[in-house]
Each structure stands twice: as C-alpha cells, then as structure tokens.
Curated annotation (Swiss-Prot):
The keyword Transmembrane helix applies. GO terms for cellular component: chloroplast thylakoid membrane; photosystem II reaction center. PSII is composed of 1 copy each of membrane proteins PsbA, PsbB, PsbC, PsbD, PsbE, PsbF, PsbH, PsbI, PsbJ, PsbK, PsbL, PsbM, PsbT, PsbY, PsbZ, Psb30/Ycf12, at least 3 peripheral proteins of the oxygen-evolving complex and a large number of cofactors. It forms dimeric complexes. The lineage of its organism: Eukaryota, Viridiplantae, Streptophyta, Embryophyta, Tracheophyta. HAMAP family: PSII_PsbZ. SUPFAM superfamilies: PsbZ-like (SSF161055). Belongs to the PsbZ family. This is Photosystem II reaction center protein Z.
Length: 62
C-alpha cells in the first residue's frame, strides 16, 4: 500500500510540474488556448483526481 501511495504522490508531483510549465506556454502562444483547450482541461482533471487519490490513500495509510 505504501508503494501505491508513493507512486500516486510522484504522479501528482510530475503532473504539477508539467502543468506548471505547459499552461503558461499555452496562454502565451497566439492560438494556443483554442487549439490546446482540451489538453489543459484533461491535465487539470487528472491533477484534481490525483489530489483526491493521494488524500484517500493518505487516510488509509495513516
């Protein structure tokens, strides 16, 4: 169970880092938002899901 928690935390950190870099790049590009809107929303949904998953796993481990 601890390994699953560690992998979930790693995935959350990796997704946060990717979104931290990619979202400003999408907003700065001329047609970036209209062409990459679905990718940004998918990444944000993944991030929110990982936050809840890490919270649930943390309550099970502690």
């Amino acid at each position: 169970m601890t390994l699953v928690f560690q992998l979930a935390v790693f995935a959350l950190i990796a997704t946060s880092s990717i979104l931290l870099i990619s979202v400003p790049v999408v907003f700065a590009s001329p047609d970036g938002w209209s062409s990459n809107k679905n990718v940004v929303f998918s990444g944000t949904s993944l991030w929110i899901g990982l936050v809840f998953l890490v919270g649930i796993l943390n309550s099970l481990i502690s």
